[in-house]
Amino acid sequence: MRRVLAAGLGVSVAVLATSLLAWLGWAWYQSRLPETYSVMDFAIPDQGGAPPGAGHTHGAARATSVVDLRGPRGTPQRRFWLTAANGTVRLASGRTVHALSFNGTVPGPELRVREGELVEVTLRNTDVAGGVTVHWHGVDLPNGEDGVAGVTQDAVPPGGSHVYRFRAGQVGTFWYHAHQASATEVRRGLYGALVIEPAIVPDARVADMVVAVHTLDGTPLVNATDGVERRAVQPGTAVRLRLINTDNAPQRVDIGGTPFRVVAIDGTDLTGPTLLRRRTLELAAGGRYDVAFTMPPTPVKLAVENTLVGLALSADGNSDPSTPAPGPEFDPAVYGRPSPKPFDASSHYDRVFSLDIGRKLGFFDGHPGKQWTLNGGIYPRVPMFMVERGDLVRISIRNGTGAVHPMHLHGHHMLVLSRNGVPVSGSRWWSDTLNVEAGERYDVAFRADNPGIWMDHCHNLRHAADGLTMHIAYAGVTTPFETGGAAHNHPE
């Protein structure tokens, strides 16, 4: 009897093991991405509560290709040329680093334009083997100019070029970076600052400077300096620091020696910013804060992550004051003066979506492990939020993981309505790159007024490359571009 039971148990175990192996093999096979594919192929359309059939339809008579959603023609007021290349760059310390660069520098050249100007940028690829594009981070431009390989264009191969054109319609601090193999190419140096100034600059006497934070080859940088960048600013001068986090992780910035105001977030001005003293500013990966103050008679020090890397301002440009101690964290949800909002929690929304960020065991492109999920799905079987032009859209973002996720929506700015169920009580807070901490929930809203197929992804670009990527698609918009090895397009 025992032998019979043992034999039966052995058969059952063998059957279970065979079934498990068969299931694992099937799951592995199903997870593998095709050699080439369209971002429209595998995503799960989510209509956000709108009637069925309101979403994207392939081949419909009203279909519009992303190649037709381009910037204005005509004579540009500003022309720039960006040349991407492999090479070495010399840091302020004298150390040389092998990097990718635009125009031979890391960061690439600072581009400054005026509101209303037609801007033309010609990208040339000298020898970046994997190809390159330029994405204009935070600029709500036409979809065909967005610079995402495999969605809005093909990556530019070595020896090739591509022209971007857009009207500078927003005033504020933005940046540009590669969106082909971005987890690698941005980290290795393909990025730079873009500043859109008012059509009429109110006061040319302002000391207006970019402070771009990055980690290059393991070395923290402020602009091109791997130490303290020193600048001369005379007492009494109005100062505006444009803080840009081009890194993959949040960056904590402390300013000592003066009170200051946070006057803009992600390129949008705040209402009624008040003076802050000893406040730590945490910048989302990809995010921007504009800080303003009047230069005091004594030096001012900006420190990144409480390290020796930073910016020192003084009358003679030679001082290096002590590193400021961290203070309480700045909270944009309660900062500034409340002001009328175009929509709020009580508004009628045409589309209402939930975006739940999670992790689970599974396969991603044939690789086993603990994978990022969006609404329970592993890329590419993740939601695609479908909208119509003119829709008022609301999204609830929940982070159920133990990591922070700076969620970046291309082509739009989101109005932050609430955090963890508590309404924003300060200034209107518009964001294109929202830092969603572990366990947090944000409710955001935007008007769907910019047709296209737009990425919505984590701007920890390593997370995005590992599948934390989805898209928002307007009904009737199509793309002829494909992603994958044969297409040579790899947006993340």
What name fits each language-model region?
Residues R2-W81, L190-A212, T271-G402, R447-I453, ...:
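Extended terminal and domain-junction accessory segments
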Residues R78, E117-V121, T237-L241, D391-V393:
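Structural beta-strand segments of beta-rich domains
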Residues A85, H179, V213-T215, I244-T246, ...:
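Active-site-proximal beta-strand/loop segments in catalytic clefts of secreted hydrolases
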Residues S182, R231, S347:
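Catalytic cores of large soluble enzymes that bind and process phosphate-bearing ligands
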